[in-house]
Amino acid sequence: MKRCKSDELQQQQGEEDGAGMEDAACLLPGADLRHGEASSANSAGGPTSDAGAAVAPNPGPRSKPPDLKKIQQLSEGSMFGHGLKHLFHSRRRSREREHQASQEAQQQQQQQGLSDQDSPDEKERSPEMHRVSYAVSLHDLPARPTAFNRVLQQIRSRPSIKRGASLHSSGGSGGRRAKSSSLEPQRGSPHLLRKAPQDSSLAAILHQHQGRPRSSSTTDTALLLADGSSAYLLAEEAESIGDKGDKGDLVALSLPSGPGHGDSDGPISLDVPDGAPDPQRTKAAIEHLHQKILKITEQIKIEQEARDDNVAEYLKLANNADKQQVSRIKQVFEKKNQKSAQTIAQLHKKLEHYRRRLKEIEQNGPSRQPKDVLRDMQQGLKDVGANMRAGISGFGGGVVEGVKGSLSGLSQATHTAVVSKPREFASLIRNKFGSADNIAHLKDPMEDGPPEEAARALSGSATLVSSPKYGSDDECSSASASSAGAGSNSGAGPGGALGSPRSNTLYGAPGNLDTLLEELREIKEGQSHLEDSMEDLKTQLQRDYTYMTQCLQEERYRYERLEEQLNDLTELHQNEMTNLKQELASMEEKVAYQSYERARDIQEAVESCLTRVTKLELQQQQQQVVQLEGVENANARALLGKFINVILALMAVLLVFVSTIANFITPLMKTRLRITSTALLLLVLFLLWKHWASLTYLLEHVLLPS
């Protein structure tokens, strides 16, 4: 069977605290085997129960095909698991209401039991063993197996499971505990400190038949083996469901501990007793959650620092690498970044979950986990099997005649009562809420509603053996007391009966198998519809996932293209900025050089102007001095002036002559070659001038002899 969506959501919230999930799945075939052994022992032990009794009939209705029983057990077990998981979300009810309900049930039981107390058998009984039945007299009892009433009484007289108690045991040790004797106390269990209060009538019968050998009740023992196997099957299913349950859901299962707790009319309920939570436990839970929150916060900081380091390393490597290396580095960085982002998101989810749990604990206080609750239920169901074996084997002497008459009906009824309850749970949940998924949403309306209706709904859902068709808790309690009384008085009649027509139809109708098959077909149809809807949902989710993946890939491709364009544009801008900087530097150098040259030219022009002004001032001063000195001797000055002019003219002529000669000589002195040739020419002329006489003599006598 597939789990519903709410179960998966609850399992995801507590994934960090998950334990072994499939411990009890392997024990189901063993439960079927033990059930088969019990049925064979039942059929074999019938003739040996008493010499004067009739042989028990062949239990024909119990011989179902193994495949059908297996399918039925699997389907009912899964529905039982879903029902239990959603029934544990109830709120607290007051203890005064429980006490009042138990007192009303006791009063109704006493009023209904007054009709049978006048019989001779009832007068001989002790006050603790009075019977309560819907029958008018002892001879008008219906043909209901009396031992089954004792089973109902044992189940209804279970002790309350205390808050905080749990079974620290694995699935493997559960099989050994189921095989141990019912009278031997279980070792290592927290239930040793609280004794199971037995019913007063059952205690009297056990005390009366304590000395009887167990061989006289072989049929009862065989029947109880079958019933114990059914109870063990339910216990293992409950344990497996508890292991699979979400540990984050803090709920508690507590049975009423009122004055009528040990009586047979105390139905099992899911009420949590009112009272302040344990401060030490609350403080420890808050400290534990604070430590987890600090740890998750440190992990988030470490992941963020690692992501920042990756970003810095990527930027550092990307600046020093070429395009191919940048693409590879980018891919590696994106993978690391996505992984870091996923890790940080998961850590944030865990942090929010822990904060939400811390807020719930601070507001409502801590409560037990579903795993501990279901383990306590497992222990309770195992104790039920032990009490069934002890009870039926104990009153075998006075009751064995009535038991042998309905041997096959008892085995079928007990098996149906213990194993078929998950189907009744699921039917009740479906009739009240529409589906098991709506219980969490209807939790608040149940709180706001009348307390009698809430108590009736919870008691009808959580009573393990009673029928869900009772009108109220009082009727359920009266029916339970009636069945217990009929079981106590079964020595004089063929059997007892419950006061509910639903119970008679369920356990005595010949068309029970057809009804079960019809319900099984309905369950299969519902499962097929659920599978179809799940397949449609998966298909829709796959399409959405494909579409989102495609959109993400397109966006990623677009992002990569935009990033490449941005990188190209950034490189272009960087190149342009570099060129502009170079041009600005060259222009700055040019401007500085030009300004320096211009300033030097201006400075030279200013200096020349200052020199000319100075010369003019000197000339003016000289002229003034000459004018002052030549005032007395004007003629001398005139002659002197003329003489100076003549001298200047001669000097000018001389300078002209010198300049002319220099103009002739200057072309001969421009280069070194010309200077050398000019010097040689002058030397030759000097030699010729010096030896002119010899030269003339040579010319006259040698060259020109004629």
UniProtKB/Swiss-Prot annotation:
Region Disordered, residue ranges: 1-221, 251-280, 440-459, 464-510
Basic residues: bias regions: 83-94
Basic and acidic residues biased stretches: 120-131
InterPro entries documented for this protein: TEX28/TMCC
Phosphoserine sites (modified residues): S6, S435, S461, S467, S500
Keyword rRNA processing: no
Gly residues: compositionally biased ranges: 488-498
Annotated keywords: Coiled coil, Endoplasmic reticulum, Membrane, Methylation, Phosphoprotein, Transmembrane, Transmembrane helix
Subcellular location field: Endoplasmic reticulum membrane
Ranges annotated as spanning the membrane: 646-666, 679-699
GO CC terms: endoplasmic reticulum membrane
Highest taxon listed in the record's lineage: Eukaryota
Composition skew (Low complexity), residue ranges: 102-112, 477-487
Signal sequence range: none
Coiled coil: 330-365, 511-630
Residues that bear Omega-N-methylarginine: R163
Biological process, per Gene Ontology: amyloid precursor protein metabolic process
Topology term for the membrane: Multi-pass membrane protein
Pfam families linked: Tmemb_cc2 (PF10267)
Similarity annotation: Belongs to the TEX28 family.
Subunit text: May form homodimers and heterodimers with TMCC2 or TMCC3 via the coiled-coil domains. Interacts with ribosomal proteins RPL4 and RPS6. Interacts with APOE and proteolytic processed C-terminal fragment C99 of the amyloid precursor protein (APP C99).
Cited function: May be involved in the regulation of the proteolytic processing of the amyloid precursor protein (APP) possibly also implicating APOE.
Name this protein carries in UniProt: Transmembrane and coiled-coil domains protein 2
Annotated organism of origin: Mus musculus
